[in-house]
Amino acid sequence: MMTRLVPNIFYNSLSEGLDLFVTCLGFKVLHQDATLAVIERDGAKAYIVESAEFAAKDRPQITIETDSIDELYREIQSRAPHMLHPNSNRIEKKPWGAREFGVLDKTDVCVVFRQF
């Protein structure tokens, strides 16, 4: 039945979202038009939507679970170290048992990577 939850992530400019998800995180663009990009990597998918109205209302935190956090961290650290979250810029073991780190873009969209 249900196979995947796919979020819409709103930005003032489509290029801001593509900078985080494509340039920093290595997602591929499956479709792009003037106000929408469908992105995907390793089965994780999202819609990047240009909408100043909704971007002003919502700056989400998104969590992506991974089975290879060390490899992913090294990749992002070499690709875009400036985007590592200032409060979560290295892999840390959390009290709930997960290992995590995060990235933060200039619009305050946060992506947390988690491995149990």
Please annotate each region the language model reported.
Residues 29-60, 110-115:
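Conserved short beta-strand elements that form part of the metal-binding/catalytic scaffold
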Residues 14, 62-110:
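Vicinal oxygen chelate
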Residues 15-24, 101:
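Conserved active-site alpha-helix within GNAT-family acetyltransferase domains
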Residues 1-18, 62:
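N-terminal beta-strand motif that seeds the catalytic metal site of vicinal oxygen chelate
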Residues 1-3, 54-58, 95:
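Short glycine-enriched loop/turn motifs at secondary-structure junctions
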Residues 24-29, 80-82:
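Conserved acetyl-CoA-binding loop of GNAT-fold acetyltransferases
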